Design a protein with these regions (language model features):
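Soluble FAD-dependent oxygen oxidases
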Residues: 1-331
Length: 331
């Protein structure tokens, strides 16, 4: 194991990650390689009255750590057992590793739309996969959790017999947003289909996936900029890594989202004065939760909590909770 203090060569690299707007500011970094190293790091923190925080990829950085940072990226072994259809992933493993090792066996994990996200961090937040409505939360599939205190050193979880999926995306110019939002909202959604709606500046993007066939014709309510839908290997639906960048974001879980409210949210996001991208995922199906929708906001800059809160004000009376995932650079 390597240990880094401020000023050491490698300290900056070790505390950096996908989020470039914020970095951890630890007194010491334990770059762990096994569970015994994690024990040592936790012991160091506890005996000195310091906080300890885990850093894997930095995708989910909320508040920068100031005490002990446990960097897990070297502790990233993944083992697949095709007989029992299980995977064991160490603390630093990312989904791409699991997908690559599982797919030759016709198996797949319940990973999300970015394959470079950490398996453990994602799963601890429930894990909304690209097939979430068909198969439930990633955390529903956990068989065994190995821990040192509150630090998960490895997870063992079920893989699913998934090879090909029906998946794709439609992109529209934002000038058609009202019609696209309406078509998305009125979709008589089969329980096996997992869709998302995302705004990205001038574009509204719809994505959808299932292991079973389904129809998206009714979503083509305006000319499409991208129209891609078909049968493909699960890995292709599992998202490509993005380059590191600066972003701030938060989310709410809702128990209803009437169309007029959705339109007000859309307008509030587009009138926020700063870029606010909106993400909407209908829940239900195999996701056993009282919430019917997950609404996410994300901006490519920091210091926009107030603008996000003003957009969330439009849905305040429907809020029943918040997902631990999809919270970025917020305390
Ligand atoms: C581009 C992008 C796409 C995403 N897509 C999805 C998606 O499709 N579905 C979804 O559900 N989520 C998604 N997320 C959210 C993601 O799952 C969370 O941000 C998650 O916390 C990232 O975990 P990490 O380990 O990669 O990040 P890190 O920033 O390294 O860790 C985040 C936090 O997770 C906890 N954590 C991580 N590892 C451990 C451990 N071993 N023991 C204890 N705690 C630990 C810690 O609290 C840590 O601070 C996405 C995020 C981004 C930025």
């Amino acid at each position: 194991m390597r240990i880094f203090y401020p000023g050491d060569t490698g300290y900056d690299d070790e505390r950096s990650g996908f989020q470039t707007g914020l970095r951890h500011e630890p007194q010491v970094i334990f770059a762990v390689e096994n569970a015994r190293d994690v024990e040592q790091a936790v012991h160091h923190a506890e005996t000195r009255g310091l906080d300890h925080t885990v850093h894997t990829t930095g995708h989910g950085l909320t508040t920068p750590a100031t005490g002990v940072l446990i960097s897990t990226r070297r502790m990233n072994n993944v083992e697949i057992d095709p007989t029992t259809r299980t995977a064991r992933a160490e603390a630093g493993a990312v989904w791409q590793q699991v997908i690559e090792q599982a797919s030759p066996h016709g198996l797949a994990p319940l990973s999300g739309d970015a394959s470079d996200v950490g398996v453990v961090g994602y799963t601890l937040g429930g894990g909304f996969s690209v097939l979430a409505r068909e198969f439930g939360f990633a955390s529903d599939r956990v068989r065994k959790t190995e821990k040192v205190g509150d630090v998960v050193t490895a997870l063992e979880f079920d893989l699913l017999e998934i090879d090909q999926v029906h998946a794709g995306e439609l992109h529209f110019d934002a000038e058609h947003a009202e019609a696209v939002f309406e078509a998305f909202h009125s979709w008589d959604l089969p329980d096996h289909v997992t869709p998302t709606l995302t705004t990205l500046g001038d574009v509204v993007r719809l994505t959808f996936a299932s292991t079973r066939p389904f129809d998206v014709d009714h979503l083509r309510v305006a000319p499409t900029l991208i129209d891609e839908f078909g049968r493909k290997p699960f890995a292709e639906a599992a998202g490509k890594p993005l380059p590191p960048h600066t972003y701030q974001g938060d989310n709410v879980l809702l128990d209803d989202l009437p169309l007029d409210v959705l339109h007000r949210v859309r307008q509030a996001a587009s009138n926020a004065g700063v870029p606010v991208f909106l993400g909407l995922m209908p829940l239900g199906g195999a996701l056993k939760t009282e919430a019917t929708h997950l609404l996410k906001l994300i901006s490519p800059l920091l210091g926009v909590e107030q603008q996000h809160e003003e957009v969330f004000d439009e849905v305040r009376s429907f809020v029943v909770g918040r997902s631990r995932n999809f919270r970025y650079a917020v305390g």
